[in-house]
Each structure stands twice: as structure tokens, then as C-alpha cells.
Amino acid sequence: QMPELPEVEIVKQSLSKKIEQKKIKKVIIKNRNLRFKIPIKFEKLLQNKTIKKVTRFSKYLILNFDDDSFCLIHLGMSGTIHLIKKNTLNRFTNTSFYKSPELPKKHNHVEIQFEDINVIYNDPRRFGFFKFIKNKQALIKRFSHLGPEPFSRSFNLKYLLNYFVNKKKDIKMNKVLKYSLIGI
């Protein structure tokens, strides 16, 4: 089932503790065929970048690089992130939300290597994706169709009342709901 907003927040917090202020040494793509095909140049775009901060908007994880470019990560329906310390010979994995005694052997599609840790993206269904975003303007444009972040000041009773005024459809049937109330 699809990771919920709180799970994505926990993954963000776990990544923040482990990879912020660290330089990407190497990116290995084992399967480019995710929801959106990972371009051939993706590895080169990320290699040698330093992660300034890990953030989240809706269910998107955002790696903020020191050159003001970004990498969006969406876990899709079944994606998980595994954090592997390099000196453990892959015998232990901390997946930041789930605990597992060993690294899954199948469906590891993306590996981001740092000096002391590897970040592995595992996704049996391949509905997740990675996307390089070149600058802040492109990132803002990417999210412009979405509503406010649920924990922001702009997501309040006034916003909800304005959103639901004159809506005739059942809440569950409202197709734009996922864009107006992000994280659902």
C-alpha cells in the first residue's frame, strides 16, 4: 500500500540525520524503468553534489543540493529507503520506517553512495520515481498545482471552508481532492 504522509516524514527525518552535509560519491541505477524512466545522465547530475538539506513537500522527498538544484524522490505504492553503513557488509539495514535484519535482494533500483553510508531505493511495484530539478523556479513550478502543506499556516479552517464551499461531489469522489489537500 502507498506510504502515508507521516511515513514519508519519518523517512525524511531519518535521511536528514544520515546524509545532510554529505557528498554523493557515486550513483548506481540498477533499473531505470520506474514510474518515469530515469534518464541516462541522472548519475552524472547527482555525482559529487553535497546534500545541503533533506526536505519534504506532500509525499515527495526533496534532496536540496549545495548548488541549489534538487532531486525529487517519490516512494510510489511500495517504495522503501534502506540506509546501509558501508562497514557492515550489508548484513544490517535500517529502512528508517521498517526494521529488517537484512537488505532485500530483489527490487533495489537506485543506490546513492556516500563515504560512510549507502542509500538504497527498493520498490517491487516500481511506481516511485526520481527526478532531477535544476533550480528553485522549476521546483516551485513542479508543485504549483498542489494545495498547501498540511502542517503549514496556510492549511487552516478558512482554507478548508473555502475549498468545500459549493462542492457537490462526495469527498471520496472528488478527483481534485488529492491536489487541494496534499498528502492524501
Where are these regions (language model features)?
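Extended, highly charged segments
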Residues: 2-71, 75, 84-87, 91-94, ...
